[in-house]
Structures are given as C-alpha cells and as structure tokens.
C-alpha cells in the first residue's frame, strides 16, 4: 500500500505563501447565490453528500447550482493523494459509507437530473481503489432514475488489480472520464502520486473492454506547459481513442498550492480547440472556465450525435467500396 501523504505536503510542493495572481477579466464570475442555488445547496447538505464543486473550489459553482447541476463526489471528502493543484483535503479517509449510493440516487431523483456526473477522491487505502462503490452508485442511480445518463470521473486505480476497472466497465457508465491533468514533464511536481502513462493506459483499457462507452479526459493549462507538449498529449489521447477532450485554465485555490504560470487567453483556447478537432476528437470543450463536468449533460448529447454521424460516414464509405 502506498504511503498516504501528510496534509501539509501540498505546501512543500508549491511556493508556500506565494500570493495568488490577479485574474484577468475573462475569468471573473458572479458570486453564487439565489433561490435555486440555495435549494441545490440545501438538498446536498440534507443528504450528507460532498460535491467536487465545493471541495475543488470550482469557479462555475454559482452557474451550475442555479441550473440544478452538480458533480457528486463519493468515497468521502479526504483524499490519499496530495496533488499540488487540488483543493481537496489530504489525509486518512473515513470508512466507506454504505448509504452513499442511495443518497446519490436520491439527488438524481429529487433534482430530476437527465445527466449526472459522479467523481471521487483517490482511495489508495482500499483494495479496489473504490471501484466497487462506483458500481454500487451506478446501479443505485439506474434503479431509481433509469433515464438518467451517468458520467463518472475516476481516479487512476494505480496499483490496483485489473478487476477494479473491469467491474466499472461491466456497470457500463455512459461516459468514463479520467483526466490526465497536465503534460508528462510536469507530473513529478503537479501529480506526484500519479504516472502519466498509467492514466493514459487506463483510458485505453476502457475502450478495449467496451468500445461503446464514451471516454473523456482533460488538461489544465497555465501550469508551465508549452504548446507542443499540449499537442503531444492530444496525440497520445487520440492514440488511446479518447472521444472527448476538455481544456481549462488552472486557478490557484490558495497560496499554498502551486502557482499559476500563465493565464491562457481565450483566443489560445480556441486555437487549441481547432487543433484538437483536426486531430479527430469527436467533442472538444476548450475555454478558460471549462471544467470536466461543466455543461456535461449538453456536451454528452452532442457527443452522441457526433459519434452517430461518424458511424454513418464510415458506413457510407464502406458501402461505396462494396458497390
């Protein structure tokens, strides 16, 4: 079992005490609030659930919660990793809550969700990395709200047996998302507990086991990567047959986290999106405020449509060859 980092290890991997750079105008958002926002907040509190919206200090929380959209975080609020960019607490997690799957299903039902995103902290302390809890949550949501489509955003299950991933694939989430987060060169400082090719291989394994499951991955920009490195990651993702790419600006949560090296301009995000589409991604979301689950439901609908068009194009091409 890997060592669980101490809660202050994020500080030692960043410029401790460095001031947070002032955000440019294109990153400014309205403060959260309003009746719909408070209703979503109240429901999540009532069911005792955590959301990545809060734990990761997402800038889009006001907009998403007002629209009755939230990304549920299972397996507790304490992570066994200490990624330098992440605002989630690090330490020794609590025991897995057996009531959690039912509570997530309650959220899907009470919010009348067409699409739900389920993520988790890393649980290196568990034999299967928490895979069985993902399966129970998927099954509970399907039983309660069969029409709700399900997207999961998973950890890397590094060092866990293959059956951990196998059981999730057999549960057939509609979208399997695992973020590469940054370019390989920056992994030792940004994702010290992870390995780039382990994460890439995870996405590839999902497609090998069930090609019908959509795969998705994302990068944070502004950590010191360069354009060619981002393009290489795109190529690696396409080699792994990833369908959907998300690109967003890294924002430093607190002074103890790794600092922002660059605020990437909206025009640069548009240029990256054009490159990604040219490389063959079925769906690309690329903007300063893009996050993995931002507009996830609408993007999933467009992703299905894009795949259908691609299949029809292939069928027409094959039909022409046989004529």
UniProtKB/Swiss-Prot annotation:
Task: Please give the catalytic activity noted in the UniProt record.
Answer: [[Fe-S] cluster scaffold protein carrying a second [4Fe-4S](2+) cluster] + N(6)-octanoyl-L-lysyl-[protein] + 2 oxidized [2Fe-2S]-[ferredoxin] + 2 S-adenosyl-L-methionine + 4 H(+) = [[Fe-S] cluster scaffold protein] + N(6)-[(R)-dihydrolipoyl]-L-lysyl-[protein] + 4 Fe(3+) + 2 hydrogen sulfide + 2 5'-deoxyadenosine + 2 L-methionine + 2 reduced [2Fe-2S]-[ferredoxin]
Enumerate the subcellular locations listed in this protein's record, separating them with semicolons: Cytoplasm
Species this protein is from:
Zymomonas mobilis subsp. mobilis (strain ATCC 31821 / ZM4 / CP4)
Q: Which cofactor does it need?
A: [4Fe-4S] cluster
Q: Cross-referenced PROSITE patterns, in alphabetical order?
A: RADICAL_SAM
Q: Which leading EC class covers this enzyme?
A: transferase
**Residues where [4Fe-4S] cluster 1 binds:** 53, 58, 64, 293
Specify whether NAD is a keyword of the entry: no
Protein's name according to its UniProt entry: Lipoyl synthase
Q: What's a Gene Ontology MF term here?
A: lipoate synthase activity
Q: Record's superkingdom? A: Bacteria
- List the record's Gene Ontology CC terms alphabetically: cytoplasm
Entry keywords, A to Z: 4Fe-4S, Cytoplasm, Iron, Iron-sulfur, Metal-binding, S-adenosyl-L-methionine, Transferase
InterPro entries, per database record = Aldolase_TIM, Elp3/MiaA/NifB-like_rSAM, LIAS_N, Lipoyl_synth, rSAM
- The Radical SAM core domain sits at 65-282
Q: In which pathway does it act?
A: Protein modification; protein lipoylation via endogenous pathway; protein N(6)-(lipoyl)lysine from octanoyl-[acyl-carrier-protein]: step 2/2
From the UniProt record, report the name of the gene that encodes this protein: lipA
Membership in a protein family? Belongs to the radical SAM superfamily. Lipoyl synthase family.
